[in-house]
């Protein structure tokens, strides 16, 4: 695409935040910076719209009609969230459809805008958009030359013979292919020959020495002919191959043979890998690499990088995080033309999409079904009408990057060669709230045997068990009549590992929606289960991006005692439920940061008969198992008689454990009574200490939001003996809730309120009211 100045009164730019000034690290850019820039860019686009709905146009390369600024602006506004029924969109659509276009770029952007419009319009307007879409697609398809490429104007309309000598270039061609792909996603049928001709052209023109592409025009000595490949054309060429290979050769490695994948087409994979290697070696966000003029079409280059990153799942090209570095570069740049502004907006907006699945790269056969998660993600995008992406990660990545997606997907066709450090990393991932989906690719028997040993080694506390039809991953949001056979590791709070001993990924790779849609729906159910419907983070958001809670606005005041000791009780049953998530470490750190109260917590597990001078005995469990020997029950009663305090919690808000606690209280001769909202445990007002007021304004996790309407206070049950409060029982989850991790159907508090309730319990122990 040739250079073009956008004739506006002043400089089109979005101001960079002060923190992003020159010299600041690339990862200083935040999602807040990105969303602010996108909104400002949207305002600039709207401000430059003419009264008739169009944008200022230019004509290039002998085109009879406008070049496509209006089409490009319309598509960009639709993509970044401008409502399709707004006046600006309505006027822009009318202006676009009121004029003809014979310019390939304009026609391509028109098709993409119409495809986007028809997704969102009401029935009558949608029908109009679809008819116009069909007409434009027919023109663009007819404009392809026999060699597979496109010129600035449709080749037949330009007077060229529909033969291999007609002029073309790969910039026009990649735009046409992108537009036709968008149309195909909107349900418009594109002749297979269109993709075949284009793919053949790209394979013919790829530089076999380094995997790159140039402009492709044999008569352009600077950018085409035999000149070296450069950034924007290589990224666009690679994105085009992803499109054509997905359409022409779906299901690389599928269907499965006995325990092994089908032989993939090695040539196409090698071509794609060569181009990806070029991207790794040459990526820079600040220039169009290897171009004669590196400043030329730099934002076009970054837009193409985003397309490759999203299609390939690569978060990094070499050592470069393409979105982080690209976003900082874009936000540091003045956008002087309408195309620059649109490319910048599309890069920023599309690249920040939340990540649904991370696919693990490891030493071994990890990618025999190369497009499995890519195709599943595409299905979910359509089903949810929301933009998502997927990524490839390795175990050398920081834990924060592994947690960028709710699911870590591991598929292996040979036993992975995990080091001891790798195994510890995977255990740390699940212990910090992560969820793993492991597949024995094609049901490989060697991987099946290896996995059983591996699971016992890394997660020895739990046994693999088949998931029954009532498991949440089979019910929500889709109630699956047909289900894959899945095993799981469940810790009493959540299933943190899902194991498919038979192949599920070939259905995704082959896009077998018609015959095996239940597997695609299970992919939606799975991330829903892992997140409990919590919103996913945008690309540059981190776990600590949330604004500080007003819950902690009032500082904690400690009473006369500044140290509390706590021990977790061991009993016959799941006494260690939730321990691996280290809630006590978080609670200890919170108190250290915000008060002078020191918590010494021993979670190794003590039987009641071994309790001595601990201030608090913590009794946690999930399910209905709570069996304590007569010796330990008497020891617990004696401990409480000496002034100890019992903190009982139904992990996950388990109703069955709540019943077991009531049976234990009956056996021990204790009385259970609800704690009144005026009690210090809820008001946070102790004799000398001050905690948090959880008698009002308390927020709950999803499973309790409706049932607690009108009851926005913490719920604690007092454990009494002879009228004295000797402990509390929480029927709702506190400890797991305060970690901030997610568990499907968890009956607990939002993070801040869970922490506040826990703090109040400890403050009560450190500063109890005087006995009457």
Task: Tell me the role of every PLM-derived stretch.
Residues 167-169, 407-448, 616-658:
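Short alpha-beta junction capping motif
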Residues 350-407, 411-414, 504, 511-616, ...:
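Aromatic-Pro/Gly-enriched surface loop or interdomain linker
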Residues 1-13:
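Bacterial N-terminal signal peptides that target proteins for export
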Residues 444-531, 542, 549-550, 562-565, ...:
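An acidic, glycine-rich "communication" segment
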Residues 10-22:
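Bacterial N-terminal signal peptides
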Residues 27-40, 54-88, 99-196, 204-325, ...:
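An alpha-helical repeat/solenoid feature that recognizes helix-turn-helix modules
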Residues 75, 110-112, 141, 149-151, ...:
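Structural recognition of the beta-strand scaffold that forms the well-ordered cores
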Residues 80-83, 101-104, 116-119, 146-148, ...:
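Solvent-exposed loop/turn segments at secondary-structure junctions
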């Amino acid at each position: 695409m040739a250079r073009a100045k956008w004739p506006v009164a002043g400089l089109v730019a979005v101001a960079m935040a002060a923190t992003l000034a020159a010299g600041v690290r690339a990862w200083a850019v935040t999602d807040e910076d990105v969303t602010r820039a996108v909104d400002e860019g949207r305002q600039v686009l709207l401000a430059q719209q003419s009264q008739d709905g169009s944008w200022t146009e230019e004509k290039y390369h002998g085109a009879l009609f406008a070049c496509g600024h209006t089409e490009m602006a319309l598509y960009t506004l639709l993509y970044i969230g401008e409502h399709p029924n707004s006046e600006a969109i309505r006027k822009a659509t009318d202006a676009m459809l009121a004029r003809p276009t014979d310019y390939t770029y304009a026609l391509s952007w028109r098709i993409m805008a119409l495809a986007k419009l028809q997704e969102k319009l009401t029935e009558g307007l949608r029908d109009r958009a679809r008819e116009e879409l069909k007409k434009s697609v027919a023109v663009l398809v007819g404009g392809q030359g026999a060699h597979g490429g496109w010129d600035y104007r449709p080749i037949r309309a330009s007077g060229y013979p529909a033969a291999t000598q007609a002029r073309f270039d790969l910039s026009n061609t990649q735009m046409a292919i992108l537009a036709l792909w968008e149309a195909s996603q909107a349900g418009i049928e594109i002749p297979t020959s269109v993709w075949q001709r284009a793919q053949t052209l790209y394979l013919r023109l790829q530089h076999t020495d380094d995997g790159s592409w140039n402009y492709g025009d044999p008569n352009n000595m600077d950018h085409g002919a035999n000149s070296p490949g450069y950034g924007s054309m290589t990224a666009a060429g690679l994105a085009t191959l992803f499109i054509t290979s997905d359409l022409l050769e779906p299901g690389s490695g599928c269907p499965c043979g006995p325990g092994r994948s089908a032989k993939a087409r090695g040539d196409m994979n090698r071509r794609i890998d060569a181009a990806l290697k070029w991207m790794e070696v040459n990526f820079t966000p600040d220039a169009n690499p290897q171009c004669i003029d590196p400043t030329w079409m730099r934002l076009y280059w970054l837009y193409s990088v985003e397309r490759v990153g999203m299609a390939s799942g690569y978060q990094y090209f070499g050592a470069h995080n393409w979105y982080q570095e690209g976003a900082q570069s874009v936000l540091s740049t003045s956008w002087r033309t309408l195309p620059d502004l649109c490319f910048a907006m599309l890069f920023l907006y599309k690249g920040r999409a939340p990540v649904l699945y991370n696919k693990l790269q490891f030493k071994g056969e990890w990618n025999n079904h190369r497009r499995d998660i890519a195709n599943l993600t595409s299905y979910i995008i359509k089903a949810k009408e929301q933009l998502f992406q997927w990524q490839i990660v390795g175990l050398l990545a920081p834990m924060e990057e592994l947690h960028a997606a709710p699911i870590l997907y591991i598929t292996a066709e040979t036993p992975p060669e995990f080091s001891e450090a790798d195994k510890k990393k995977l255990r740390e991932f699940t212990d910090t709230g992560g969820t793993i989906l492991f597949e024995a690719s094609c049901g490989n028997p060697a991987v099946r045997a290896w996995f059983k040993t591996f699971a016992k080694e890394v997660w020895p506390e739990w046994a693999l068990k088949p998931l029954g039809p009532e498991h949440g991953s089979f019910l929500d949001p889709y109630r699956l009549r047909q289900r894959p056979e899945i095993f799981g590791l469940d810790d009493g709070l959540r299933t943190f590992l899902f194991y498919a001993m038979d192949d599920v990924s070939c259905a995704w790779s082959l896009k077998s929606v018609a015959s095996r849609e239940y597997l695609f729906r299970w992919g939606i159910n799975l991330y829903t289960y892992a997140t409990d419907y919590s919103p996913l983070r945008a690309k540059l958001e981190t776990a600590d991006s949330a604004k500080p809670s007003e819950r902690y606005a009032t500082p904690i005041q400690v009473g006369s005692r500044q140290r509390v000791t706590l021990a977790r009780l061991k009993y016959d049953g799941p006494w260690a439920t939730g321990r691996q998530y280290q809630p006590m470490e978080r609670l200890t750190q919170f108190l250290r940061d915000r008060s002078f109260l020191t918590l010494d917590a021993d979670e190794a597990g003590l039987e009641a008969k071994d309790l001595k001078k601990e201030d608090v005995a913590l009794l946690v469990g999930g399910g209905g198992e709570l069996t304590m020997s007569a010796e330990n029950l008497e020891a617990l009663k004696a401990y409480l008689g000496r002034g100890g305090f019992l903190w009982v919690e139904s992990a996950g808000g388990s109703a069955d454990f709540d019943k077991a606690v009531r049976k234990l209280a009956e056996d021990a001769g204790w009385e259970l009574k609800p704690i009144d909202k005026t009690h210090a445990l809820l008001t946070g007002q102790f004799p000398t200490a001050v905690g948090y007021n959880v008698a009002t304004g308390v927020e709950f996790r999803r499973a309790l939001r409706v049932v607690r309407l009108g009851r926005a206070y913490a719920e604690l049950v007092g454990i009494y003996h002879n009228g004295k409060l000797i402990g509390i029982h929480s029927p709702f989850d506190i400890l797991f809730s305060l970690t901030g991790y997610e568990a499907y159907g968890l009956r607990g508090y939002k993070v801040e309120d869970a922490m506040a309730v826990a703090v109040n319990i400890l403050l009560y122990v450190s500063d109890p009211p005087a006995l009457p």
